[in-house]
Every structure is written in C-alpha cells, then in structure tokens.
From Swiss-Prot:
Mg(2+) 1 binds at S94, E227. The gene is trpD. It is an enzyme of class 2 (transferase). The keyword Acyltransferase does not apply. Belongs to the anthranilate phosphoribosyltransferase family. Signal peptide: none annotated. The keyword RNA-binding does not apply. Its EC number is 2.4.2.18. This is Anthranilate phosphoribosyltransferase. InterPro entries: Anthranilate_Pribosyl_Tfrase, Glycosyl_Trfase_fam3, Glycosyl_Trfase_fam3_N_dom, Glycosyl_Trfase_fam3_N_dom_sf, Nuc_phospho_transferase. It catalyses: N-(5-phospho-beta-D-ribosyl)anthranilate + diphosphate = 5-phospho-alpha-D-ribose 1-diphosphate + anthranilate. Homodimer. Pathway: Amino-acid biosynthesis; L-tryptophan biosynthesis; L-tryptophan from chorismate: step 2/5. It comes from Francisella tularensis subsp. tularensis (strain WY96-3418).
C-alpha cells in the first residue's frame, strides 16, 4: 500500500500521480481516512497542478470500487450531466434534458447529488417535485425499463461521499470532485454527454472517457457554461471508436436564435421547479426550450443522428407537446409506491 504522506509530498511539489497513487488517494478519501485540513490541502494542490486523465480515471475506479452495484441494463443507456461549478446558477438544464430525452424514447440514467456550489442541484430540484431519490437499485432499474428514466442519487450508492462534503463546502471552489461527478454514474451508461466548466478540461475529460472504455460520448464547454450553449460557441470533443474528434458548434448549427446567459438564470429549488414545470408542460419560454433542446439534440448525435438542426426541431416539438411532464409524473408516482 502506498503511504498517504508520499502521495501528498508529490502533490505539494506539483508532481503528477501515477495510476496506483491516485487510486490509493481516492480510496483513502472515500473511506474517510483523511482529516479535513489535509483534504482541503490535497484538493487545492490537485487543482493548482491540474489533474491528468490518468489521475481522474484512477479516481473514478477507486470510487466505483466503493459504490453499490447497479443492475445491468440491456441495450443502450444514456447519461447527460454537467460538472457544475460554472458559477452562472442557470436553471437545471441537464436534468430537464434527461426528462425530455426519456420522453423522446432514449433510456436515460440521471445521476447526481444535492447542490454544493449552485443555488439548486439536480436532486434538490427532483426532491422539490416529490421524487423519492433514495429508490433501491432494482426499483430504479425497473423505473428505467418502464419510463426510460431513472434517477440515481450518488450519496445513496456510496455513503463515503459524506467524508468529503465539508471540505468541498469550505473550499467554495471547483475541485476534482466536480470533474469526477459526471463520471461516477452507478448505472455505467455507454452513451454520455458531459458538460465541463472550463475549456481546459475538455481533452482531459475526453481522454478519461476513452480510458474508461465509454462507447460514445461528447464533452462540451459552452463558452462559460457546462453544457451546450445558446448564447455563443460550444467547444466539443466527440468520442467514437476510441478516437477523439474536436470541433465547435454555435446556435446557428442547431437552427435556433442566440440568447443571453441571463435568460437562463435560475433560483432556489422552488423557483426552478416552476420554471422546469412550465418547460415540461410545453409552456416554457423560448430560451429555456432552446437550451434544453440543443442538449438533447447533442445526445441524439451519439445514436448516429448527425443532423443537429433536425434533432433540435424534433425535440422542440416533443417539448411543446407537453408530454414530458407526464413522464416525470409517472416517475414521481412510481418512486413513491
């Protein structure tokens, strides 16, 4: 076993960790074997050094090895998630996009937790809707099979995350756990859209996904947002056959107007719930509908639907039909049986 001291010394010298060292470090983290002051120092050192794709992949495996197993789903399974930490406090776009994608017929396992840095995390929102977020894995699997949608509350699958909650709250800044968050979906989807909070993270995240053996994925950075943007360009790294292709898209590529970031500003869970409810009922504002639609359109690309304009129009029609709220309501009812 590698000693914690030797790992910490390397980090203090801003040296990269080996796969084994990073695995051991995050095994210590998740088992609560690192004191709070040292946790904050380690997370700060990693951030200053900049995390490598090897360190991230090793950390993911360490976290998975300390997580409850989720039953395997037959066929394709999608995930759509952001790192958080972009600082804009937008409405919960990835959560809404997951519900809309499920309505469109794609199986989506949405994982996450309560808010650390924003006003309302994805599961703060879901709880405000009345979703029972602590559903047993076999029940969540059945929910996925019935309604194409399942919510996986990460702390329910690994109570070790409580050991790092205080350090993250104290630091009030983005840490490697923002990067790890999107990668630790217990359902292990094979098609994922991941939004990152920094352009510098696009390639490390994409390389990590290749290292983890993900089938198809896109990593996106939306000019300040950790999702596909409707206010400016979105930088993309797409993964297919272990290859990474980088490109850029703009609102015009999706056939939509350009909007301002402030058009997407969210609030407390109760305020967000009302905004999201209106979107799902087909009564949302144009900017809100567009933001959700472009993110689902990007997910559809992973299913060989390459025409982003056509994808976006299809999704907008589904949103405006009001059917999306029915799916959420069925999941709420199922989760509270």
């Amino acid at each position: 076993m590698i000693s914690l001291k030797s790992i910490v010394d390397k980090l203090y010298n801003l040296e990269d960790l080996s796969y084994q060292e990073s695995y051991q470090l995050f095994d210590y983290f998740i088992k609560g074997q690192i004191e709070l002051p040292l946790q904050t120092s380690i997370l700060t050192a990693l951030k200053l050094k900049k995390e490598t794709s090897i360190e991230i992949a090793a950390a993911v495996e360490a976290l998975f090895d300390n997580t409850k197993e989720f039953p395997k789903i037959k066929g394709d399974l999608a995930g759509i998630v952001g790192t958080g930490g972009d600082g804009f406090n937008t409405i919960n776009i990835s959560t809404t996009a997951a519900i809309v994608a499920a309505t469109a017929g794609y199986k989506v396992a949405k994982h996450g937790g309560r808010s650390v840095s924003s006003k309302s995390g994805s599961f703060d929102l879901l709880e405000s809707f009345g979703v029972n977020i602590e559903l047993a894995p076999d029940q969540t699997k059945q929910c996925l099979e019935l309604y194409n949608l399942g919510f996986l509350f990460v702390p329910f699958y690994s109570d070790g995350f409580r050991h790092i909650k205080e350090a993250r709250t104290i630091l009030k800044t983005r840490t490697i756990f923002n990067i790890l968050g999107p990668l630790i979906n217990p359902a292990r989807p094979n098609k994922v859209v991941i939004g990152v909070y920094s352009k510098d993270l696009i390639l490390p995240m994409a390389k990590t996904l290749v290292n983890l053996g993900i089938d198809r994925a896109v990593v996106v950075y939306g000019s300040g947002l950790d999702e596909v943007a409707i206010h400016d360009d979105t930088y993309v790294a797409e993964i297919q056959n272990n290859q990474i292709i980088e490109y850029k898209v703009s609102p015009v590529d999706f056939g939509i107007d350009t909007y301002a970031i402030k058009d997407l500003e969210g609030g407390l869970p109760e305020q967000n719930r009302e905004i999201i409810k209106q979107i799902l009922l087909g009564k949302g504002k144009e900017a809100h509908n567009a933001a959700v639609a472009v993110n689902v359109a990007m997910l559809m690309k992973l299913y060989d639907k390459d025409d982003l304009k056509q994808n976006t129009q299809e999704v907008l029609e589904i949103i405006k039909s009001g059917k999306c709220f029915n799916i959420l309501q069925q999941v709420i009812n199922y989760s509270n049986k």
